Every structure is written in C-alpha cells, then in structure tokens.
Amino acid sequence: MSVDAATVRRIAHLARIAVTDDEVPHLQGELNAMLAFVEQLSEVDVDGVEPMTSVTPMQMKKRADVVNDGEIADQVVANAPATEDHFFLVPKVVE
C-alpha cells in the first residue's frame, strides 16, 4: 500500500493537523515507511510463539477490581471550558 499526497492531506484533515504543502512530501515518505514496516511485520513467522505482555518474565502486581468514582469529579472537570453533571461538553465532530 502506498500513501499519496491527497491521502496525507485527508489524514491531516481528519486529525485536525495543519499541514503545509511543503510538509506533505516529507509526511508522505514517513507514512509510507511506517506502512512498509507494518507489511514486514505481517511476514514474520510467529507459529509456536506464545503471546507476551512484557519482554521480561515477571508477575504483575494485582489489585482488587473495585469500582471507585475517585470522589474528585468536581476537581476533574474544574478546568473544562464546558461541563454538565460532571461530564465534559465537547463540540459535535461527527454528523
């Protein structure tokens, strides 16, 4: 798969990132390099390899799975520009 300049501009638009025309070729190369690396990963033979969560064998410390509201909802939303009933209000982005 190859990314063209139009795709770079579309990705930037969807991500709400301002990209100049001078930056498009560089970003196009970066995205193509990332996709090429992912394609290489799909070719790796992983038969017989067990999934792992860490490169070092260690036991993870476990804690009780207890629902907790944190009791700081007012502090969490204190700096938000708009809130309602301890929820953040954000502009609609999907029509």
From Swiss-Prot:
The keyword Protein biosynthesis applies. One of its GO terms (molecular function) is glutaminyl-tRNA synthase (glutamine-hydrolyzing) activity. InterPro entries: Asp/Glu-ADT_sf_sub_c, GatC. Pfam families: GatC (PF02686). Gene3D superfamilies: Glu-tRNAGln amidotransferase C subunit, N-terminal domain. Its EC number is 6.3.5.-. GO terms for biological process: glutaminyl-tRNAGln biosynthesis via transamidation; regulation of translational fidelity; translation. It catalyses: L-glutamyl-tRNA(Gln) + L-glutamine + ATP + H2O = L-glutaminyl-tRNA(Gln) + L-glutamate + ADP + phosphate + H(+); L-aspartyl-tRNA(Asn) + L-glutamine + ATP + H2O = L-asparaginyl-tRNA(Asn) + L-glutamate + ADP + phosphate + 2 H(+). Transmembrane segments: none annotated. The keyword ATP-binding applies. It is an enzyme of class 6 (ligase). Keywords: ATP-binding, Ligase, Nucleotide-binding, Protein biosynthesis. Heterotrimer of A, B and C subunits. Allows the formation of correctly charged Asn-tRNA(Asn) or Gln-tRNA(Gln) through the transamidation of misacylated Asp-tRNA(Asn) or Glu-tRNA(Gln) in organisms which lack either or both of asparaginyl-tRNA or glutaminyl-tRNA synthetases. The reaction takes place in the presence of glutamine and ATP through an activated phospho-Asp-tRNA(Asn) or phospho-Glu-tRNA(Gln). Belongs to the GatC family. NCBIfam families: gatC (TIGR00135). This is Aspartyl/glutamyl-tRNA(Asn/Gln) amidotransferase subunit C. It comes from Rhodopseudomonas palustris (strain HaA2). The gene is gatC.
